[in-house]
Amino acid sequence: MNNREITSLWSRLIVEELIRQGCGFFCLSPGSRSTPLTVAVARNPMAKWKTFPDERSAGFFALGHARATGKPAILICTSGTAVANYFPSVVEASMDCQPMIILSADRPFELLETGANQTIRQSGMFGSYSRWNFRLPEPSAEIPLQSVLSAIDHAVEKATGNPPGPVHLNVPFREPFEPELSDLKDPWLAPVAHWIDSAEPLRRCSHAENVPHPAVIEKTAELIKASRQPLFIAGKLDSREDAIAVGLLAGSLGIPLYADLSSGLRYSTHCKPWQLAFQSPAFLEHYRPDMVVHFGGQLISRHPGAAIRVSHPGNYLVVKPSANRYAPDHNVTLSIEASPKLFADALLRDLQNVSLPAWKGPVADEFFTFSEEEIEHYCEDDRPVSEISVARIVSRLTGEHDGLFMSNSMPVRDMDLFAAATRQTPTISIAMNRGASGIDGILSTAAGFAEGLQKPVTLVIGDIAFLHDLNALSLLESSSVPLRIIVVNNNGGGIFSFLPIAAEKDVFETHFATPQHYSIASAAATFGVAHASPKTNREFADTCTEAFESNESIVIEITGSREDNVSAHRSLQHTINMLARKFLKKQ
């Protein structure tokens, strides 16, 4: 067997084993050194793939695909700086526990650190952000093929383990790269003959859910029974099953549940919009939780954390599926590594016949009702569409089984705060890049999320984040499902207008707000994507309704000013705080 045959077979086995492990979607970036892997993907009838000229975009697309499927998409690139372009998406995947597998082609050993062209130190380049990094040997008939298959199996195991995350396999190749069919009866293949004849991977892996210890359930139940004002928090939850279980627990016990947008429960009619209350100083003067059970990961808003710092609850429990640390204020008293669903189910069984102290539910309900009526004023048909009404209207119009992706900065905060709760159960697939909370790669991630879901996805994004990932619009032409992109164009970084630096007029506009004067419509036209620019809430709702019924991607641009947005937010918040004072007098 010659070198071309060995290299071709080596690559075919790697790709085939990944597919047998259920990792059959490949994000390919063109390059010479990665030719054997690319050809192996292209010629495998079971492989699904998409080609990306930009590795940075590919990395975020793979991230979005994993968010939708729970399985790692496979990234393949050539040697050199190509693999470094994955770094931002690797950080996000690592921080937010999303599976990812990178196969980076590399120069062989004899060319490393010699000044050879397009040769860098690739092995271990992602440092602590990878769950496992490993350099495969150069293809050789001296290497047992079982060891190659076993390495691939372990890569999948680490990428999908607890916690999931990125895995980096460095795959060196010597020239020539051009494919050549090999003789499958060669003695080198004899030890894996059974594998060749089957459709199974060499080794499967299994990950069990963390079952809560009965003693921990009992302790938690006792703490809740002894509490005067308990609070449940649902942070980022990884599954619909987790969300349903946590929502059922809170509803059955009558304990307030702060449901973050990332929990999947924010749209549930069973959950009150506690975001409105926790932004009200007047409300927090009267509601001071003395015991908190926090399910899942981090929150979008800083206000619950600030309120808890003030109330100093004697017990703050965090229930999360892995041992990753969550204690940004260093006030967690018990960290519980367990499945949120299994923990919530067990806790409900323990407490279902227990009478708990009543809290002022009717007063709070009245406050929430009137507060949401104030938000609805901003959504009146003939009013100009605003960042507040965008969140409210999109939350109402998103289809029952569609996807929603929220960009960082203001869009995700507005949706968390102003969304309308219109669903009995959490059916909308909601995603966001909140691991490291950057604005980079948002369009690419949303496109990957839609591809993974195989459902239409609505993306709400600011103008700066849109421009940051503009080349991702090229992905939509070959997409199998539409992406509806709502661009909130306030001519710059709107979130900075809410920060104290906005008062420093001599530096704010040029160094922080960074106004841009590019045409969003022209950008969309360049990539052949439809564009609309509604001016009123009625026009926006009609445009969204039409877009949501179409199978075509579209950019819907909402223009406004940062100054008007800050004024509207502060005015609405003042009104809500006044409502809190009014209704709290009834207690």
From Swiss-Prot:
The domain of life for this entry's organism is: Bacteria
Q: How is the cofactor bound?
A: Binds 1 thiamine pyrophosphate per subunit.
The answer on whether this UniProt entry bears the keyword Transcription regulation reads no
State which pathway it belongs to: Quinol/quinone metabolism; 1,4-dihydroxy-2-naphthoate biosynthesis; 1,4-dihydroxy-2-naphthoate from chorismate: step 2/7; Quinol/quinone metabolism; menaquinone biosynthesis
Q: Which reaction does it catalyse?
A: isochorismate + 2-oxoglutarate + H(+) = 5-enolpyruvoyl-6-hydroxy-2-succinyl-cyclohex-3-ene-1-carboxylate + CO2
* SUPFAM superfamilies found in the cross-reference section: DHS-like NAD/FAD-binding domain (SSF52467), Thiamin diphosphate-binding fold (THDP-binding) (SSF52518)
* Keywords, alphabetical: Magnesium, Manganese, Menaquinone biosynthesis, Metal-binding, Thiamine pyrophosphate, Transferase
GO MF, any single term: 2-succinyl-5-enolpyruvyl-6-hydroxy-3-cyclohexene-1-carboxylic-acid synthase activity
Cofactor dependence is on: Mg(2+); Mn(2+); thiamine diphosphate
Residues crossing the lipid bilayer are none
- E.C. numbers: 2.2.1.9
Matches recorded under InterPro entries: DHS-like_NAD/FAD-binding_dom, MenaQ_synth_MenD, MenD_middle, THDP-binding, Thiamin_PyroP_enz_TPP-bd_dom, TPP_enzyme_TPP-bd
Q: Which GO terms describe its biological process?
A: menaquinone biosynthetic process
- NCBIfam families for the chain: menD
Q: What does this protein do?
A: Catalyzes the thiamine diphosphate-dependent decarboxylation of 2-oxoglutarate and the subsequent addition of the resulting succinic semialdehyde-thiamine pyrophosphate anion to isochorismate to yield 2-succinyl-5-enolpyruvyl-6-hydroxy-3-cyclohexene-1-carboxylate (SEPHCHC).
Q: How does it assemble?
A: Homodimer.
Q: Which HAMAP family match?
A: MenD
- Similarity-based family: Belongs to the TPP enzyme family. MenD subfamily.
The name this protein carries in UniProt is: 2-succinyl-5-enolpyruvyl-6-hydroxy-3-cyclohexene-1-carboxylate synthase
Instruction: Name its species.
Output: Chlorobium phaeobacteroides (strain DSM 266 / SMG 266 / 2430)
